[in-house]
Amino acid sequence: MKTLSEIKEILRKHKKELKEKYKVKSIAIFGSYARNEQTETSDIDILIDYYEPISLLKLIELENYLSDLLEIKVDLITKNSIHNPYVKKSIEEDLIYI
């Protein structure tokens, strides 16, 4: 199981590629990994914001790319997709930006 520090380092190393290929403006970890409550079966929750909208197919491609890169199942959401204010507040409390 990777640590939060290892995950952050991997994402930092690929930040330029994420920006160029997927138009990622910012990337943040939230959920169990951000709260240091992850288990062997935990996935990693990642929030992205982008410079320009990307298609659903590109978003799925990015989610798969990150899962392969981190060797952990990634649940990816975009900043613009959070409409429920309670969910948004809960996520924002955990965010660790890379």
Curated annotation (Swiss-Prot):
A motif (GSX(10)DXD motif) lies at residues 31-45. Its cofactor is Mg(2+). Mg(2+) 1 binds at residues 43, 45, 75. The keyword Signal does not apply. Keywords: ATP-binding, Magnesium, Metal-binding, Nucleotide-binding, Nucleotidyltransferase, Toxin-antitoxin system, Transferase. It comes from the Archaea. Mg(2+) 2 binds at residues 43, 45. CDD domains: NT_KNTase_like. Its EC number is 2.7.7.108. InterPro entries: NT_sf, Polymerase_NTP_transf_dom, Type-VII_TA_antitoxin. Binds 2 Mg(2+) ions. One of its GO terms (molecular function) is nucleotidyltransferase activity. It catalyses: L-tyrosyl-[protein] + ATP = O-(5'-adenylyl)-L-tyrosyl-[protein] + diphosphate; O-(5'-adenylyl)-L-tyrosyl-[protein] + ATP = O-[5'-(adenylyl-(5'->3')-adenylyl)]-L-tyrosyl-[protein] + diphosphate. The keyword Nucleotidyltransferase applies. Probable antitoxin component of a putative type VII toxin-antitoxin (TA) system. Neutralizes cognate toxic MJ0125 by di-AMPylation. Belongs to the MntA antitoxin family. Probably forms a complex with cognate toxin MJ0125. This is Putative protein adenylyltransferase MJ0126. It comes from Methanocaldococcus jannaschii (strain ATCC 43067 / DSM 2661 / JAL-1 / JCM 10045 / NBRC 100440).
